[in-house]
């Protein structure tokens, strides 16, 4: 298990740290202990390696703290990424036997609050910070529901039922609505308005689409539209407010998709497992702008920063600069 720091301008490796795990759990499917994405506050970087736990480094590669979490992981391992919110480091820790939503102190890794999950707990979704307009909430798909939690205490505020075990996509939000999708059976996507308490399944769901439109990738909300992607390269664009399907197209790159779409400069970027990058206009009418091949297996979601898009394949890290 490795943590590597690169110079964003040159690609030079600045430092590399090995995390020596006594045991690396076997995982099924396409998962691995290094699936979760690191997160940074600009001073430190926080990484999660499944059953090994959390590790924090400063930007010079010095270990600040580590937090064992041996109870995390299940048949398919862990895939949830850590998230920062104020002084909190949030993590969805689930397993076949049990699990919890953890809020740790960014400075020390110590627990600030810990909310146990009800059975069945297995979930691969990452916590999502939702600004409702009346305050922020932590949203997570777990235990057959999408749930909202108080970030100060971890107390459950509301829930929407009907979600299966093992959901992978992370929620998204825009225009005052929250979007949550299921990639298992039953497969669907819902839009939820804020303000509810308790079970709001019948009161706060604004629209619902009952056909499967996502696989592993999370939905993307941008420019008044919601984009969803499933295996086979089938992409769906919704009107984010009404749920109307504006278009559904099969991209030139078929096959499986694990990376979530990202947006920048009015475009949506999607990457197939085979490393085919499709660039789509973030518009109410389908527009295929370009298709490029990395020629390498790609599971990680792209990242956009400083006018560049960073793509991690199984073999390499690429930085692609936009036109000036």
How does the language model describe each region?
Residues 1-324:
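Noncatalytic, solvent-exposed loop/strand surfaces
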